[in-house]
């Protein structure tokens, strides 16, 4: 049951992933309707618009996304309460496409690889919590305990967001 809950949280989180940053972008920071405003502004302004959400308890950035012409496009980032990255990746025209990295809460890379059309492709590297490379294999061969850490970290992130931290 706990695993199903984590997978549900992961799926919900994946549905709301976004992207970040461009030198010709407009910045919109806030919550709630601010995301919808960023999407609309990106259509009107015809340039990338950043949406940024901060943790209420720390004031640090929780997530950064970029919208271009109303779609997710470019780098996205998610952050732990401590300010370290949870994950970062890239969207292209609304589809996950590019380098993808997941992180331990201490800031070290957990795993990294490449996404194309919302799917993991090629070999992925995975690391221990000290940052030491443990292996490089196709995504479906990454040890289950590494994937479980990834899912747990993401589920915890979305739980913190939902709890208004």
Task: State where each predicted segment sits.
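Glycine/tyrosine- and acidic-biased, solvent-exposed loop/turn segments at the edges of beta-strands
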Residues: 19-165
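Bacterial N-terminal signal peptides
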Residues: 9-17
């Amino acid at each position: 049951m706990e695993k199903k809950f984590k997978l549900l949280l992961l799926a919900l989180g994946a549905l709301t992933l976004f992207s970040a940053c461009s030198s010709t972008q407009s910045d919109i920071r806030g919550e709630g309707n601010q995301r919808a405003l960023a999407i609309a502004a990106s259509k009107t302004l015809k340039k990338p618009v950043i949406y940024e959400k901060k943790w209420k308890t720390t004031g640090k950035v929780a997530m950064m996304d970029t919208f271009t012409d109303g779609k997710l496009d470019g780098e996205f980032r998610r952050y732990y309460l401590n300010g370290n990255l949870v994950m970062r990746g890239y969207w292209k025209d609304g589809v996950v496409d590019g380098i993808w990295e997941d992180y331990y809460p201490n800031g070290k890379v957990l795993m990294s690889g490449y996404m194309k059309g919302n799917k993991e492709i090629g070999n992925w590297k995975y690391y221990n919590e000290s940052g030491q490379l443990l292996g490089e294999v196709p995504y479906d061969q990454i040890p289950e305990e590494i994937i479980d850490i990834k899912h747990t970290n993401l589920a915890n992130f979305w739980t913190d967001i939902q709890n208004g931290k």
